């Protein structure tokens, strides 16, 4: 698909906000859903504050789309409650919920013009023609498509079709907007620009929104909060910063961005890794006993590298390593590092395993450096490095 230029949304002063309504969040409690003998949702709960956006993120089959269909009224939960601004809606039909849905394919009517598509819902609701025309004109101004009003969907770009779909959903003043992977069909440049503009528009209008996506970058950018689903269960719910920097499960750590996972055990204030290295625990772990197995998780950008004879400036020294692979990705450089046996690291501070060991260490870790860090210390496959960590988390 050829790249398209996306003009910014017009300022929203042309939009006349509806009369203030009860400022309550949408709340889902204990949602469960079965399809035959398969449970696709298991006790999922979340809420969205007024004017905020929640992103449901997860792999295929995690229950994202089923959750959206339950909120939209396209499916009925087997158990659980859904409230919108204090009103129970799980028993209501879709058209009774006052919820707008923007689908992946936009679902525009091909034989209706842009203006007719935007006003379709109002016509179905039997709004008078004059009032309907006023709303359509305001929305065309809001999305910057006044000069496209008489064109058909096939005559405008994908980004413009997305805007028409949003305007159509906004026409009848919904209390909630649902986006079902609505950006996936757009080229990367259009998708990035449109995401930012839609987020700004939603904030300006104060409309809560629920986004469904498997795109991690989209989730981080669009969501005030992110709910990560896996096999029908809610793994973690939090702000983008919380779920990325403080993952509560291995799945969250490895699904939302890249992560190194190293196994070991707990030893009275230290972490003994399976690769024969030891690190001081980052904080007291009173819930652990000496035989407990643990997993240490750290992001590639948490790894810091130094030359073979010096020490990296970090409180957590992981040891010596050998560069196995280097790839340049533009703004960053990605490396694969193989940790060397403990015999190479016996003199490093913060390592307390005693004498060296001949036991091989087959642990591979991923590291990411900025282009400026890469220029400061040139590395290639076969280079020896000292390896440290800026931070890590124990599960």
Predicted regions and their residues:
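Non-catalytic connector elements of ABC transporters
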Residues: 2-9, 13-14, 270-395
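ABC ATPase nucleotide-binding domains
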Residues: 53, 94-251
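The feature captures the beta-strand-to-loop junction immediately N-terminal to the Walker
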Residues: 57-59
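Helix-to-loop junction immediately C-terminal to a conserved catalytic motif
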Residues: 72
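Conserved post-Walker A/P-loop segment of ABC ATPase nucleotide-binding domains
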Residues: 75-83
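ATP-binding/catalytic-site motifs of ATP-hydrolyzing domains
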Residues: 81, 87, 233
């Amino acid at each position: 698909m050829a790249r398209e230029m996306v003009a910014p949304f017009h300022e929203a002063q042309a939009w006349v906000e509806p009369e203030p309504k009860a400022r309550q969040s949408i709340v889902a409690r204990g949602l469960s859903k079965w399809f035959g003998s398969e449970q696709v949702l298991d006790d999922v709960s979340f809420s969205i504050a007024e004017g905020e956006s929640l992103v449901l993120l997860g792999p295929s089959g995690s229950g994202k789309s089923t959750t959206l269909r339950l909120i939209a009224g396209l499916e009925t939960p087997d158990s659980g409650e859904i409230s919108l601004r204090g009103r129970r809606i799980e028993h209501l039909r879709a058209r009774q919920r006052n919820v707008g849905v923007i689908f992946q394919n936009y679902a525009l009517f091909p034989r209706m013009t842009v203006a007719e598509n935007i006003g379709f819902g109002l016509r179905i609701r039997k709004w008078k023609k004059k009032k309907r025309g006023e709303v359509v004109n305001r929305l065309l101004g809001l999305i910057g498509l006044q000069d496209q009003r008489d064109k058909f969907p096939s005559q405008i770009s994908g980004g413009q079709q997305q805007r028409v779909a949003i305007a159509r959903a906004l026409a009848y003043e919904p209390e909630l907007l649902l986006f079902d992977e609505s950006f996936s069909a757009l080229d990367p440049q259009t998708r990035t620009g449109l995401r930012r503009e839609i987020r700004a528009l939603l904030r300006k209008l104060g409309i809560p929104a629920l986004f469904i996506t498997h795109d991690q970058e989209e989730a981080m950018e669009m969501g005030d909060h992110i709910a990560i689903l896996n096999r029908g269960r809610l793994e973690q719910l939090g702000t983008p910063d919380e779920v990325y920097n403080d993952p509560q499960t291995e799945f969250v750590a490895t699904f939302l961005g890249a992560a190194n996972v190293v196994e070991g055990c707990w030893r009275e204030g230290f972490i003994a890794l399976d690769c024969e290295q030891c690190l001081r625990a980052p904080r007291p772990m009173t819930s652990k006993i000496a035989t407990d197995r643990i997993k240490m998780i750290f992001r590639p950008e948490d790894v810091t590298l130094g030359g073979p004879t010096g020490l990296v400036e970090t409180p957590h020294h992981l040891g010596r390593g050998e560069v196995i692979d280097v790839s340049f990705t533009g703004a960053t450089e990605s490396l694969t590092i193989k940790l060397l046996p403990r015999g190479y690291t016996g003199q490093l501070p913060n390592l307390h395993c005693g004498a060296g060991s001949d036991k091989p260490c087959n642990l591979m870790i991923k590291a990411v450096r900025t282009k400026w860090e890469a220029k400061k210390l040139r590395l290639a496959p076969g280079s020896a490095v000292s390896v440290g960590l800026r931070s890590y988390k124990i599960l």
